[in-house]
């Protein structure tokens, strides 16, 4: 599924119903008093998180949402019907911003809990409300007020347990395809992943975690170069980061220098990301069939990065070492979630 992480929409709450101007007119009661009823309140617009959704793609096709207007009041002191509220379902983790001011209106992270985004208009008052001892036949009413109207920017941060980090063509898309049901676009040129993608990795019938395939970064991404820093934000909610490195780049670049460039981007964008658990994944070991040469390359990378945390050597395209990696990730995620409970 194509993963869309931003959308611009317009929402408009319902207008309140107008108050009614009416007088009681019945046989043998020639001068009945006022009996104009109030209007109904306009419908409000709520956002609600749904765990069944994981994309904002629907908002690319429907951009305008309007709640029902309140009904106007009627004679006989009948109040108009309230406009029906509109509840818009969004994926868990959706951030709702006012597109005009940039204000964060809501972080929709709890499924099943409606969050008010646009308040419906207040009902108008009928002429009955203005009856007094000095004005027995008021002709005054008030109209219903308009509902709130907002231009919104929806932003979805990937709710994933594992984030894949690395330069373009490090093999992240291949890895996520190898261990999950994700069908990420894979080819031998940079930026094959143009949208963040999610893959569910199932290590047993009752154990699974979500892996986020973040588009490849280049030097300067924190300032918006390449595919820009818009993708770095997807790493903020992951439990663990996998730093995927191409052990034998076809362009002859230095894997250590490549890795340091990514770490530099992380530091510039958000230094707190460096405090997350980060594991080193040395990919494409199939490109170095000689065992001695491969081991020397692995050790030189570890030494060059002064890496102290876990290291996994894999071939994503041949699924070598991926099972061990997934079991280790599942164990870490379980431990982290237990400690938070």
From Swiss-Prot:
Disulfide bonds: none annotated. Pfam families: GTP1_OBG (PF01018), MMR_HSR1 (PF01926). GO terms for cellular component: cytoplasm. GTP binds at residues 166-173, 191-195, 213-216, 283-286, 315-317. Belongs to the TRAFAC class OBG-HflX-like GTPase superfamily. OBG GTPase family. Residues 1-159 form the Obg domain. Mg(2+) binds at residues 173, 193. It comes from Legionella pneumophila (strain Paris). An essential GTPase which binds GTP, GDP and possibly (p)ppGpp with moderate affinity, with high nucleotide exchange rates and a fairly low GTP hydrolysis rate. Plays a role in control of the cell cycle, stress response, ribosome biogenesis and in those bacteria that undergo differentiation, in morphogenesis control. Its EC number is 3.6.5.-. InterPro entries: G_OBG, GTP-bd, GTP-bd_Obg/CgtA, GTP1-OBG_CS, GTP1_OBG_dom, GTP1_OBG_dom_sf, OBG_GTPase, P-loop_NTPase. It is found in: Cytoplasm. One of its GO terms (molecular function) is GTPase activity. The keyword Transmembrane does not apply. Keywords: Cytoplasm, GTP-binding, Hydrolase, Magnesium, Metal-binding, Nucleotide-binding. It comes from the Bacteria. Monomer. One of its GO terms (biological process) is ribosome biogenesis. Residues 129-144 have a biased composition (Polar residues). This is GTPase Obg.
